Design a protein with these regions (language model features):
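A structural signal for short secondary-structure junctions
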Residues: 83-86, 104-109, 114, 147-151, ...
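Short proline/glycine-enriched turn/loop segments at secondary-structure junctions
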Residues: 102-103, 145, 175-178
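C-terminal outer-membrane beta-barrel translocator/porin domains of Gram-negative envelope proteins
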Residues: 1-106, 122-124, 139
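Residue-level detector of the transmembrane beta-barrel scaffold of outer-membrane proteins
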Residues: 2, 31-35, 91, 111-115, ...
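Short Gly/Pro-enriched loop/turn and capping motifs at secondary-structure junctions
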Residues: 99, 118-123, 162, 174-176
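Outer-membrane beta-barrel transmembrane domain signature
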Residues: 29, 97, 111-153
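Predominantly the C-terminal beta-signal and adjacent terminal strand-loop region
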Residues: 36, 42, 160-179
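Short beta-alpha connecting loops at secondary-structure transitions
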Residues: 73-75, 137-141, 151, 167-172
């Protein structure tokens, strides 16, 4: 028998996620892949500050599934940089396998990808900023209102082993230095 600590502490909340992924083969060894993700908090209960950045993902990836930004949501944006009661994001990438070879009777490939990722807050978290100076408000909070996109683009390298084990490294650069 297990129970979520949030319910034991009396701070329940519900989050809803709608995730769509699709892959297209454009030519031999060239694919286009995209993911669209919408997440929102349901009900009247407020989400505690420590649980606010949690994102629901297609795969259980522990601490790295927090907030927009980082390898699991918007690559090139600092992890946990963009948080809201409702968020949306998309990942769009072209993948190309440029070298296939056999080694030790195993099939390998090297590939690259170019990507564009973008996310936005659809419903901001209500915060009391009365104690925050106007300068700090302009520096730290001005770009995080509802409807402002946080975007990045980049490139990656993939090493595939027998088509089902892939090591991937991506480097993304945010369009806004504040991200």
């Amino acid at each position: 028998l297990t129970a979520d600590l949030r319910y034991i502490l009396g701070i329940p909340h519900t989050k809803l996620a709608i995730i769509h992924r699709q892959y297209f083969s454009l030519a031999k060894d060239l694919q286009f892949a995209y993911r669209l993700d919408y997440q929102t908090t349901l009900g009247s209960n407020k989400v505690p500050y420590f649980a606010q950045p949690e994102l629901i993902t297609s795969f259980l990836i522990a601490a790295s599934n927090q907030g927009l930004g980082g390898k699991s949501s918007v690559r090139g944006i600092l992890r946990n940089r963009v948080v809201g009661d409702a968020v949306g994001f998309g990942n769009f990438e072209f993948r190309y396998k440029f070298l296939r070879f056999e080694w030790l009777k195993q099939n390998f490939y090297l590939g690259t990808n170019v990507f564009f990722d973008s996310g936005l807050v659809l419903k901001p978290i209500e915060m009391d900023l009365s104690a925050v100076s106007a300068t700090d408000r302009a520096t730290y909070f001005s770009n995080y209102e509802s409807g402002k996109f946080h975007s990045a683009a980049g490139i990656g390298l993939k090493i595939g082993w027998n088509e089902n084990f892939v090591i991937s490294a991506d480097y993304g650069k945010a369009f806004n230095k504040q991200d």
